[in-house]
C-alpha cells in the first residue's frame, strides 16, 4: 500500500508542484475578494452594489472565454498561466495603491475585478488543459479531485483568514499577502516544464478568428455525448447557485449572523472532504456512472434539506450535497480530458467554462426571486398552500424556500433519469476514443520523477 502511494506521488509529482502554487495563489485571491466584499458593503450598505462585485468577476469570464480558448491552444500553456497570474495581480496591486493614498472608490473595484477576470479567462482553460499533459490517465480523477479540493480549501480558509488579516494588517496587508501568494505560484510554474502538445491538422488549419472562437462549441455539437455531459455538468452549477442564494436567508431563520459563518464553513469542509475522497480513491473506472450516481444522490439530499423546518436537517442535507459535487466535477473533467484532443482542449474547456460560469449566476437570478416572490408567499401562514402542503412541511418564514428546495431535488432526480436514458451521454466513454496525451504525460513523468525539471 505504501509503495503504491509512493508510486502515485511520483507519477503526479509535476502536477502537485503546480497545484500547490495554484492553491496558494487561490487562497490569496479569495482572501482579497472577501476583504473587498466587506469593504464595499461597509462603504455603501447596498446589497446591489455588493452583488455587482460578483457580477464583474463572472461576466468577463463568460464573454472572453470563447476568445481566450483558441489563443490558449496556440500558446504555451505554462507561459499562459504565468502571464495571466502576473497580469491579473496588477489589478489587485492598483487597488492597494489607491487604498493607501486614500483614493479608492467602489467603481475602482468593479474595474479591477473586470481586469482580473479577463486574464482568468485565459488562465482557467490553460490550467485545465494542462492537467492531461502532467498526469497519466489512471490518475486523472485524482488530479481533478485535488482541483476540487483546492477550491474547497480556499472556501474555508479565505473568510477566516480575511477576517483576521483585516483586523491586524488591514486591506493593504491582505493585498501584500495576495501578491506574495501569486509570487509563490509563479515560482512553482517556473520550476516545471510542460510537455509540448502535438498540434493536430484540424487545430492548425488556417481559419477565421470567428470560426476559431466558436470551434469549441462546434466540436461539442459534433459530439452530442460531450455536449450532453457539459450541459448536465452545468445544471449542477445552476443548482449550486440556487442553493447559495437560498442558504443565507434560510439559515438566518434559525441562527444569528455570527453562527452563519460556521454553517457556511461546514459546506466548505464538505467540498474538501469530497475532493480528498476522489484524490485518495481515484474514482470509478466508468466515470459516467459516478456522475449519474452522485447527481441522483444530490437530488435526494436537496429534497431532504427542504423537508423540515430544522437547521440540522437542512445542514446535513446540503453538507451531503456538497460532498458529492467534487465527484461530479472530477469525473466530468476526466471524461472530457480523455475524449478531447489536447491540441483543442483550450477551446473546448473555455466553452465548457463559459457555459458553467453562466449557469451559476443564472441560479442566483432565477431561484432567488422565485423563493422571495412566489414560494415564500405561498407557504406563509395564510398562504395558498398553507392548508395543503403546509400541513406536511410546515408554514411560515423559510418554508417557501424549503418547498423550493424539495422541488429542486425532485427536478434533479428527474433530470438525472432523463440523462441516463440519453444513449449518447450514457455511452460517451464507449463511443468516443480516448485521445488524451497519456503517453506524453507518462513519459514526461517517468523521466522527471527524481528531480523537478527546470526551464532550460
Residues covered by each model-derived region:
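Juxtamembrane intracellular "pre-TM" segments in multi-pass secondary transporters
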Residues: 2-15, 195-231, 440-454
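Substrate-agnostic recognition of the 12-TM MFS/MFS-like secondary transporter fold
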Residues: 16-36, 54-72, 76-91, 108-167, ...
Amino acid at each position: 500500500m505504501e509503495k503504491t502511494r509512493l508510486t502515485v506521488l511520483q507519477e503526479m509529482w509535476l502536477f502537485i508542484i503546480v497545484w500547490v502554487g495554484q492553491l496558494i495563489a487561490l487562497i490569496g485571491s479569495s482572501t482579497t475578494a472577501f476583504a473587498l466584499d466587506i469593504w464595499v458593503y461597509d462603504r455603501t450598505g447596498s446589497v446591489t452594489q455588493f452583488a455587482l462585485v460578483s457580477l464583474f468577476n463572472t461576466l468577463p469570464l463568460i464573454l472572453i472565454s470563447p476568445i481566450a480558448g483558441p489563443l490558449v491552444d496556440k500558446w504555451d500553456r505554462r507561459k499562459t498561466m504565468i502571464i495571466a497570474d502576473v497580469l491579473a495581480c496588477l489589478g489587485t496591486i492598483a487597488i492597494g495603491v489607491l487604498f493607501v493614498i486614500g483614493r479608492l472608490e467602489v467603481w475602482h473595484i468593479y474595474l479591477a475585478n473586470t481586469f482580473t477576470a479577463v486574464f482568468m479567462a485565459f488562465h482557467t482553460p490553460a490550467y485545465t488543459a494542462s492537467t492531461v499533459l502532467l498526469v497519466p490517465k489512471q490518475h486523472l480523477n485524482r488530479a481533478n479531485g485535488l482541483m476540487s479540493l483546492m477550491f474547497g480549501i480556499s472556501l474555508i480558509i479565505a473568510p477566516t483568514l480575511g477576517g483576521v488579516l483585516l483586523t491586524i494588517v488591514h486591506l493593504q496587508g491582505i493585498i501584500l499577502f495576495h501578491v506574495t501568494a501569486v509570487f509563490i505560484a509563479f515560482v512553482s510554474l517556473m520550476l516545471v516544464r510542460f510537455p509540448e502538445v502535438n498540434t493536430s491538422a484540424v487545430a492548425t488549419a488556417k481559419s477565421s478568428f470567428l470560426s476559431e472562437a466558436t470551434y469549441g462549441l462546434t466540436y461539442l455539437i459534433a459530439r452530442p455525448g460531450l455536449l450532453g455531459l457539459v450541459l448536465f455538468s452545468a445544471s449542477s452549477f445552476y443548482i449550486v447557485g440556487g442553493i447559495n442564494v437560498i442558504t443565507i436567508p434560510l439559515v438566518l431563520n434559525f441562527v444569528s449572523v455570527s453562527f452563519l459563518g460556521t454553517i457556511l464553513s461546514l459546506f466548505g469542509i464538505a467540498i474538501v472532504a469530497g475532493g480528498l475522497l476522489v484524490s485518495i480513491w481515484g474514482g470509478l473506472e466508468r466515470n459516467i456512472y459516478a456522475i449519474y450516481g452522485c447527481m441522483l444522490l444530490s437530488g435526494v439530499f436537496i429534497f431532504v434539506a427542504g423537508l423540515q423546518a430544522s437547521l440540522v436537517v437542512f445542514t446535513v442535507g446540503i453538507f451531503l450535497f456538497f460532498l458529492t459535487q467534487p465527484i461530479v466535477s472530477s469525473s466530468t473533467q476526466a471524461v472530457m480530458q480523455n475524449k478531447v484532443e489536447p491540441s483543442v482542449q483550450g477551446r473546448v474547456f473555455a466553452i465548457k467554462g463559459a457555459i458553467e460560469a453562466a449557469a451559476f449566476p443564472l441560479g442566483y437570478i432565477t431561484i432567488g426571486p422565485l423563493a422571495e416572490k412566489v414560494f415564500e408567499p405561498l407557504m406563509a401562514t395564510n398562504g395558498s398552500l398553507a392548508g395543503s402542503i403546509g400541513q406536511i412541511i410546515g408554514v411560515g418564514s423559510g418554508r417557501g424556500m424549503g418547498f423550493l428546495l424539495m422541488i429542486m431535488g425532485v427536478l434533479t432526480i428527474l433530470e438525472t433519469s432523463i440523462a441516463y436514458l440519453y444513449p449518447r451521454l450514457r455511452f460517451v466513454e464507449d463511443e468516443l476514443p480516448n485521445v488524451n496525451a497519456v503517453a506524453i504525460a507518462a513519459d514526461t513523468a517517468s523521466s522527471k520523477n527524481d528531480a523537478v525539471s527546470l526551464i532550460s
